[in-house]
Amino acid sequence: MSNKEKGVNVQVLLRCRPFSNDELRNNAPQVVTCNDYQREVAVSQNIAGKHIDRIFTFDKVFGPSAQQRDLYDQAIVPIVNEVLEGFNCTIFAYGQTGTGKTYTMEGECKRSKSGPNGELPQEAGVIPRAVKQVFDTLESQNAEYSVKVTFLELYNEEITDLLAPEDLKVALEDRQKKQLPLMEDGKGGVLVRGLEEEIVTSANEIFTLLERGSAKRRTAETLLNKQSSRSHSLFSITIHIKEATPEGEELIKCGKLNLVDLAGSENISRSGAREGRAREAGEINKSLLTLGRVINALVEHLGHIPYRDSKLTRLLRDSLGGRTKTCIIATVSPAVHCLEETLSTLDYAHRAKNIKNKPEVNQKMMKSTLIKDLYGEIERLKAEVYAAREKNGVYIPKERYYQEENERKAMADQIEQMGVSIENHQKQFEELQSRHDSQVQQCSDLTCKLDVTQKQLNQTSKLLAYTEEQLRQSQYTLKERDFIISEQKKAENALAHQACVLRADLEKSIQENASLFQKIAREDKLSTDNRSLVNNFQAELAKQLGSLSSTLATSVCRQTEHLQCVEKFCHNFLDSHDKAVLDLKRKINSSMALYISHFEAMQNVVRLHKATSNATLEEVSTLASSNSISTKEFLDAEAVEANSMFDELQSTLSTHQGEMAHFARELRQRFNDSTEHLTNISAIIQRFFDKLLDESKRLEKHATTVDEIQTNSIAEFEKAYEEQSKSDAEKLIADVTSLVSNHMRRQKELVGARLVDLRETVSGNRTFLDGHVSSMEGITTDAKRKWQDFYMQAEGETKENADFSAAKHCRMESLMQKCVSTAETALKRWQSTHELVNDMGNQHVLTMHSVVRNICDNNEQHVTDFDSTRESAEEDVKRNSEDIIKSIDSLSGEERGSISGVLDTTSAHSETLDVLKKDHCMQSTSIEQIALETFQQKYMDYEPTGATPIRSEPDVPSKVTIESLRAMPMEVLLEEFRENNSFESFQVKEVKPSLIPRSPFSQINN
């Protein structure tokens, strides 16, 4: 589809005037911003408290600082040039009143003659500048031309001719301003009947007419503009230019420029229009609204365009959607009080951009045709003038006359078009005739050329025979050369093939070398990673083993100190216990010896009394009294000694109780210290705990053996002691003195022997334990490298040991309380014995008095009483001995309990060692898993990728093979070819005719 069928969009320009003096004084806000370079206009709005900018884009934008010359040079000059090319063009200004439409179109025309050389002032508008450009261009082209102008005004839907003579104007006013009618021209346009056309020859004449017509325009003062145009004006310039064709014919080119200054739309409330001015504003707005509806209909491509709703739209019909090029200049105000009209103007102008016109160049007319038409028009006008003057013409109704006139003009146009068509056909015939004549001339020329060519053909035949012989020789030579070339090509192909094979082998070798280098790089990287992994593992292992060694050394020292403390406590306890037993035995022996000596003294006194009873009765009574007193003193002394002994025993037990409490506190403190140190002990001690478990089992077995030996020894001691006590008790009746002495001696010897055995056993056990401790130290030294942390398990076991120590402490305190209660029981028993002895002494005194009184009569009875007293004393001694044995048994039981407590403690430590063994197993397993994961999973072995090339031997061609690929010398090849192909048998091949025409050699040579 051509541009003519598509159409051309209406060009829309936007011009924003600067602020007026009143607006500057009132500091009116600016709501319109122009961007000349991007051809955009931004309008600021506040809608519902929000600031919104609307942006419109036009073909060209001129801001407040733009001058009249800038607008004309950039936008109007091309349009005027198109008018001179034969187009019809329209320029009209559209916008609110007071925005500079008339200033843009007309400017200051009155000053146009004041400049030098007829130059226009800076304020000159589009119309004077267009007129000056038209005449300047025509004068520069030295063309023959004629220019006609018309100037009409549309006021309240009435058309007035602004160029009509003054007398005619008065006549029209006298006839109540008869308006000029609009008529259809039969070509889709309109014409104004009776409109005066002024022929002008210079720009100054047009300026004069323009000033005269502008002075007649209706203007009025409003609040928005002191000289507001109250009507629309249309200034038309019609140009006829004569052109000469190459054939010498003269044609007339016609162009028309319509310059429209529209009245401004206005808001009556802001413009202050009243009564007549309000009606004028209403008519103006009505015509502008119709123009807006026409624009909308054209943009939306509606079926009906309301051109006939207003005379303004009828006048602009060809400019909006017709065959005219149109330019719209939209003028706006930057002030905020004109925002509504500004937005309306911008909306209509933006929509008008989408209107498409289909401009056409006006058909050129022949000068003769134009003159003929003009003569006919003159004759018609003369006839009309004559008929009007003579009043003898035909009078018909006005409507019929207009209709016939329109039909006549339409027929005239058709006749004119047919004449033009006939002329075109005549031209085509003349062109065909000239072509025929030229073809005949060409035919005669070709005949002459044919004769000349025949002569040249004969000469060429002779030359051809000679040339064929030369050609035969040349072809034979070429055949030889072809044979040589083919042989060399074969050799070349063989060499090229061998080179390709060698190149393929070389590429394969390069690829294999690259694969080998990649493999070496992978192996190097893998070795580096494995070396780094092993170094890190070795450093971490050394760090953990160093920590294990230091922690193990500290723990071993603590355990050794703890065992030494326990051993020291046991030795101290045994020493103090041995001292207490020996002291108790010594005091009992001394008491028994003193008692026996006094008892023997009593026996001697009794015997003496029996011998001298008859002679010394009075002395017996005295001796009895003294005996009673001495016995009382003896018992008092013995009581004092017994009390001191029991006080000493009680103090000893108190000391033991304090030592046990101190031991418990020290043990608890050591367990706490052990807890703090055991939190840092590691668990990888499998071999150590295996050996330690064996040693513990041996130690436990030895302790069990020692315990059994001690138990058997104590049982044998008890059994021997009981047997000896029974035998001594039986013999005591016969001989009390010897019995008690032997009994105490044997008891001392037996106890001493047992104590010696116990000391030897303890010494042996100590030696055995020292040996095992040294063995354990050796084992510990070997296991120092394998410890790890087991914080949570050791902490739990430490708490259990602390609880166990607390329980043992409570147990020891209960035993000490039991010892204290036993001592108190012995004290009470001794006091009861002391009282019993006192009672017996008193009874003995009374008996002695009775014996003294009845000594002679009851001597035998005294002996009997003495025997009974002796038996009672023996029973008391026996009972006292049994109590002492029971006390010793109780003490032995407590010793066994203490030993069993020590064994329990040892067993608890053995259990702790078992737990440590289990933890060590777990930690050892963990380290083994870490090592396994490090050396089996993380430690990467090289895995073959399958891309490593297999060793292969290259196929290297031999030197003989390479030499065989050489081509034979040229002389040998020529000799071989000539033997197989003689020159006499060689036939010349038929030469194909060349498709490219060539000149004969003779012509080339000549």
From Swiss-Prot:
Gene Ontology biological-process entries: microtubule-based movement; mitotic spindle assembly; spindle elongation
Alphabetized InterPro entries for the sequence: KIF11-like, KIF11-like_kin_motor_dom, Kinesin_motor_CS, Kinesin_motor_dom, Kinesin_motor_dom_sf, P-loop_NTPase
Coiled coil regions, renumbered to chain: 371-522
Binding residues annotated for ATP, in chain numbering: G95, Q96, T97, G98, T99, G100, K101, T102
Location in the cell: Cytoplasm; Cytoplasm, Cytoskeleton; Cytoplasm, Cytoskeleton, Spindle
Any one GO MF annotation of this record: microtubule binding
Swiss-Prot/TrEMBL keywords: ATP-binding, Coiled coil, Cytoplasm, Cytoskeleton, Microtubule, Motor protein, Nucleotide-binding
Gene Ontology CC: cytoplasm; mitotic spindle; spindle microtubule
Kinesin motor domain segment(s): 9-355
Record Gene3D superfamilies: Kinesin motor domain (3.40.850.10)
Keyword ATP-binding appears in the UniProt entry: yes
UniProt cross-references to PROSITE patterns, sorted A to Z: KINESIN_MOTOR_1, KINESIN_MOTOR_2
Function: Responsible for microtubule translocation. May be important for the organization of phragmoplast-specific arrays of microtubules. Plays an essential role in stabilizing the mitotic spindle. Required during mitotic cytokinesis.
PANTHER family: KINESIN FAMILY MEMBER 11, KINESIN-LIKE PROTEIN KIF11
Record-stated family: Belongs to the TRAFAC class myosin-kinesin ATPase superfamily. Kinesin family. KIN-5/BimC subfamily.
Listed name of the protein: Kinesin-like protein KIN-5C
Taxonomic placement: Eukaryota, Viridiplantae, Streptophyta, Embryophyta, Tracheophyta
